[in-house]
Amino acid sequence: MEARDIIIRPVITEKSMNLMGDRKYTFIVDKRANKIEIKKAVEEIFGVKVEKVYTMNYKGKPKRMGKYEGRTESYKKAIVKLAPDSKGIEFFEGLQ
C-alpha cells in the first residue's frame, strides 16, 4: 500500500485543534492500515518524526431518510504524536 493511499484526509475539529498543542495530529486512514504503516506514511509524506500512533475504529451508524434506510461509512481514525525534536506539520500550522 502506498503512503498516499493510507492517509485519506486530515480531521479538522475543535478537539483535534486542541490536541495540536500536544503535538498530536488527527487523520482518517485506510481501515486496513496498521500503526506501523501509518507511522511510515506520515513520516514519508510530511517529513516529520513520529513518536506514537493511536488508532480508533468507528462503525457506521444506521440512518434513515423517509422510507430509505442505510448506514454512514465505517472509518478508522489515527492520532499521530510527533517526537519532541520534530518540526510540526505545515498543513496544520496555518489553521491554529
From Swiss-Prot:
One of its GO terms (biological process) is translation. It comes from the Bacteria. InterPro entries: Nucleotide-bd_a/b_plait_sf (IPR012677), Ribosomal_uL23-like (IPR013025), Ribosomal_uL23/eL15/eS24_sf (IPR012678), Ribosomal_uL23_CS (IPR001014). The keyword Lyase does not apply. GO terms for molecular function: rRNA binding; structural constituent of ribosome. Coiled coil: none annotated. One of its GO terms (cellular component) is ribosome. Keywords: Ribonucleoprotein, Ribosomal protein, RNA-binding, rRNA-binding. Gene3D superfamilies: 3.30.70.330. One of the early assembly proteins it binds 23S rRNA. One of the proteins that surrounds the polypeptide exit tunnel on the outside of the ribosome. Forms the main docking site for trigger factor binding to the ribosome. Belongs to the universal ribosomal protein uL23 family. Part of the 50S ribosomal subunit. Contacts protein L29, and trigger factor when it is bound to the ribosome. PANTHER family: 60S RIBOSOMAL PROTEIN L23A. This is Large ribosomal subunit protein uL23. It comes from Caldanaerobacter subterraneus subsp. tengcongensis (strain DSM 15242 / JCM 11007 / NBRC 100824 / MB4). The gene is rplW.
